[in-house]
Regions:
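Short active-site neighborhood of thiol/selenol oxidoreductases, capturing the structured segment around
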Residues: 77-104
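Conserved helix-turn-beta segment immediately C-terminal to the redox Cys motif
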Residues: 41, 101-121
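Short, internal strand/loop/helix patches
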Residues: 119-170
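N-terminal Sec-pathway targeting helices
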Residues: 15-29
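Thiol-/selenol-based redox modules, centered on thioredoxin-like
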Residues: 163-165, 169-212
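N-terminal Lys/Arg-rich, disordered targeting/topogenic segments
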Residues: 1-16
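Cysteine/selenocysteine-centered motifs that mediate thiol-based redox chemistry or coordinate metal-sulfur cofactors
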Residues: 4, 105-112, 203-212
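N-terminal "domain-start" segment that seeds a small globular fold
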Residues: 27, 31-34, 43-77, 99
Length: 212
């Protein structure tokens, strides 16, 4: 017969079990978004997506100096609640830049009924006139002028990489959490993005700032 637990044992439950109980309570009470994020980052083998790179630790959207093309100041943080797809590059926007804008537009369209949860952002890294040829592939995209030095401090780049190339994802909590490499494979990137939307389908923001 096993001896009854001592008073000391009762007063000090095993830490491992206590921590698991704590985290399960957090997952249940915090809602589907936190739970799905937990399983995407922690439970998935090796904690890696099938394509792209997780940004660890995540980087909250900082106070960037952003303006619309008409010069109105914009705080990107007010768009918390959306999945943000971000690309960057000079106003001249060459063929590769236009391809990126087209790709994120296709991602947006492929989101179907979840499109209202997605916002596309093009951060223009200079003060030059915007190439008029981009307005069609960038239709519906939030176009903002940005300070490239600020972006380099926030947006992670691979060795030898420039701002003009990757696609970055900001989650609805306002954290930069993933990047797709320069010249991304659009089909692979889309598959990962759709999985993120699916895994967070039950999470609804209390308020979504209307997009311009």
């Amino acid at each position: 017969m096993n001896p009854p637990p001592s008073a000391a044992d009762s007063a000090h439950p095993k830490p491992k079990r206590s921590m698991w109980v704590f985290w399960m309570i957090v997952l249940v009470t915090a809602g589907p978004f936190v739970a799905s994020t937990f399983f995407f980052y922690v439970v998935k083998p090796q904690g890696k997506p099938s394509y792209g790179q997780l940004i660890q630790p995540q980087r909250p959207v900082p106070a960037l100096q952003l303006t619309t093309l008409s010069g109105k100041a914009v705080d990107l943080r007010k768009y918390n609640g959306y999945w943000l797809m971000i690309v960057a590059g000079p106003a001249a926007c060459d063929k590769a830049c236009q391809t990126l804008l087209f790709d994120i537009r296709q991602f947006f369209l492929a989101a179907g009924d979840d499109r209202y949860r997605v916002a596309r952002v093009w951060l223009v890294t200079d003060s030059g006139p915007v190439n008029p040829g981009v307005f069609e592939p960038a239709e519906g995209t939030l176009i903002l002028r940005a300070q490239p030095e600020q972006l380099k401090h926030w947006l992670p780049l691979a060795p030898g990489e420039t701002l003009e190339g990757p696609i970055w994802l900001v989650d609805p909590l306002g954290n930069l959490m993933m990047r797709f490499p320069s010249n991304p494979d659009p089909l692979k990137a889309l598959a990962v993005f759709k999985k993120l939307l699916y895994n967070t389908a039950g999470w609804k923001a209390k308020h979504l700032e209307p997009l311009p």
